[in-house]
């Protein structure tokens, strides 16, 4: 059975420093979460990201914490490119199959950073099995 955990950020002043994703839509949640019981892998990561106006960036997700058996793991998000005639930009979401070993009952934090300081909104769904 697969289980999912989601995190979002809206209008985040993203930088090259990783920032914890500590929202779930309108709700503020813990920046870390407990790996669900009876799972051993983070099997996929789905992420959608958008930037304001003519901003552009490439984004990276970091998964860190004692819930990762093999240490920190990373996945890349879609890159955002300048769309001069638009009032915002968006790209297709990324669906990434992963094979990250996890430890049930321990914690993981999902954080995001970008190559160029940019105001972004992002949504991430992590699937465990």
What residue ranges belong to the model's regions?
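Residues that act as N-cap/strand-start positions at coil-to-secondary-structure junctions
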Residues: 27-29, 43, 92-94
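Short beta-strand/loop motifs in extracellular/secreted proteins, especially
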Residues: 41-43, 55-59, 118-122
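Short edge beta-strand/loop segments characteristic of extracellular beta-sandwich folds
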Residues: 46-50
